[in-house]
Amino acid sequence: MQFSKMHGLGNDFMVVDAVTQNVYFSPELICRLANRHTGVGFDQLLVVEAPYDPELDFHYRIFNADGSEVAQCGNGARCFARFVRIKGLTNKREIKVSTQSGRMTLHVMDNEDVCVNMGEPEFEPQKVPFRAQKVEKTYIIRAMERTVLCGVVSMGNPHCVIQVEDIKTAEVESLGSVLEQHERFPERANIGFMQVVDRNTLHLRVFERGAGETQACGSGACAAVAVGISQGLLDRKVKVNLPGGSLSIEWKGTGNPLYMTGPAVHIYDGTIQL
């Protein structure tokens, strides 16, 4: 099986063309491939499939390193867009794809950065999903024998966003791992820790569902900005600084899609015996 290794701000991916190759990924195989000592090693596996709808270009599937399939990955979407162009699967700069959570439009810019239309943030608790009676800008969750204040939103996948004073000392591993599996998130959640620098800048670390802390999380950056804007902390265009680099996020508010722009890097191509 042929594959490419790519990364978006250090969030790394194994990308496979399932349009021209006949491949099947069991959870066991994915775990084996994800192993950084005995496999390829990655945060997520991205699979390019033929479209189910003639109006679209491709179907985009995402699997975590633990074998679970997820509906969204923003950094992966940027790599997906560059991969299909590098491999000659399309020469379009505007690429329309379906995912488990809906449709996305990916735009490859002249400098090879990719702008992704991530759709409109979803704050309705049942659609996140999150157990709550009604929409709130801030929720209170009990965890680790204390109360945690957070914003909750779906960007095609569930996110919990916590504001912190100092990103360096944020309890990403300890609190993140507890909240990821909290009973109020029936499908688990990605946990973001954001430090607001000013109205156009924030620092962010994310404990990703099924992957732990990663160098960057595109949908997590989108979620943090959506929550920050809804709470009145941020303006509509924000630079998000993650451990692996920076993303530009823009959202004009309710009724509008959110846009994420950032790099996607092709590292190498490989072949592996399955």
Swiss-Prot record:
A Gene Ontology CC term for this entry? cytosol
Q: What name appears for this protein in its UniProt entry? A: Diaminopimelate epimerase
State the organism's lineage. Answer: Bacteria, Pseudomonadati, Pseudomonadota, Gammaproteobacteria, Enterobacterales
Q: Which HAMAP family match?
A: DAP_epimerase (MF_00197)
Complex and partners: Homodimer.
- What's its top-level EC category? isomerase
**Residues holding substrate:** 11, 44, 64, 74-75, 157, 190, 208-209, 218-219
Q: According to its UniProt record, where is this protein located?
A: Cytoplasm
Per the UniProt record, one Pfam family is DAP_epimerase
